[in-house]
Amino acid sequence: MAFFAGISDWVAQRLQRNSETARLDLERAYEAALYITALETEYASGRSLRRLPSQLSARQQTSLQAELRQTLRSLRHYRQRYRRHQPVQLQAGLALGRPGMGMPTIAHEKLQLIEQVLARYGQPTVHSSNPDDSQLMTSKNNSKPVPDPESDDEYLISQTSFLPRSIFGAFADLRQQLDPKAEDQIVQNFRSRKGKTLIALRFVLLLVLVPLLTQQISKSFIVGPIVDRLRSQDPEAIFLNFQMEEEAFVKLNQYQQLLRFQHYLKEAPPLTEAEIDERVREKAEEIAVEYRQESSNAIKNIFADLISAAAFAILLISSQEEIQLLKSFIDEVVYGISDSAKAFIIILFTDIFVGFHSPHGWEVILESISRHFGIPENRSFIFLFIATFPVILDTIFKYWIFRYLNRISPSAVATYRNMNE
């Protein structure tokens, strides 16, 4: 009895390990399919990338083709590993167009997306001696067709074998581990991804530092001296707008009332009217200097920000390759996040920018921008902006979910709806 119990435990552990391996392979294949779908949406408006866009340069086309070929190779590899480790009755559900016995609906949706992506690019040649040398743009004569879901019997027969599929999976894993070129391939892939990641992070750092440094340097050494010299020629130009003048008047009036209040409470030595006028005049001069500097600072901000925006635009125009690497890096990071984390991030950002409390945040942002450029605050414009812009932003976001996210990640959309409810 102990012998049979040991065999039963070994079989159960083997099945559990195969199930976990199949789950990981499915997730990796699904991430590769999502990445290819994102490339199609970005470069070909959702169509296949068999024909690369003509507006891309030759170098960009080569880089995109290599990236697509590598991702397709990974997709086919993990899809094949998944088929080896997954029981046959679960794969039958995909061939019949419905979930198999014990297959979750989300896993079935992922398999459908994987098969749809592979169907758009065909299958690699069966007799190829080196799969790494297979071209991405293969013709129908040189590619193995994707199984037709309608031919159920033929598909199931082709997927069955005399020995259990897990045995072939174990031998395939062992052969891959004993391959003398496997370590070099892993190191090469790691170095390639590491280089792309460093370039993407360095470019993000440049996108942040270049505008900030340009704004500060131009404001301190170029725009600042010019504005100070021009405004010194007109001593009467103190206030940039009427709102600053009103604020200065309120401050001066409060100071005058404070002096009289302290005099009445006898907290300060008694002052004559002449002494009160003298102190008020000194305070007025301090306020005038303060608002003259604030007005000059607002003018400096306008020209310094224009120079900073020009530097940012030049950086974007001259860094097209870095932008492509940054997009690939962002896609890998985003598609590597779980569906629940994606839904959480989406809900967080939507509640911040278009949620119930977002009008207060938009009001603070608009007031800060107005003060930064020395523009008088227009309450009517602020309320009109708050009443229209978040609504437009919410409409764009819902359209993006309907057209884009619902197609590449239906499980994330389902999780988002459940969490939002």
UniProtKB/Swiss-Prot annotation:
It is a multi-pass membrane protein. InterPro entries: CemA (IPR004282). It is found in: Cell inner membrane. The keyword Cytoplasm does not apply. GO terms for cellular component: plasma membrane. One of its GO terms (molecular function) is proton transmembrane transporter activity. Its main location: membrane. Residues 124-153 are annotated as: Disordered. Belongs to the CemA family. Required for H(+) efflux immediately after light irradiation to form a rapid H(+) concentration gradient across the thylakoid membranes. Together with PxcL, contributes to transient H(+) uptake following dark to light transition. This is Proton extrusion protein PxcA. It comes from Synechococcus elongatus (strain ATCC 33912 / PCC 7942 / FACHB-805) (Anacystis nidulans R2). The lineage of its organism: Bacteria, Bacillati, Cyanobacteriota, Cyanophyceae, Synechococcales. The gene is pxcA.
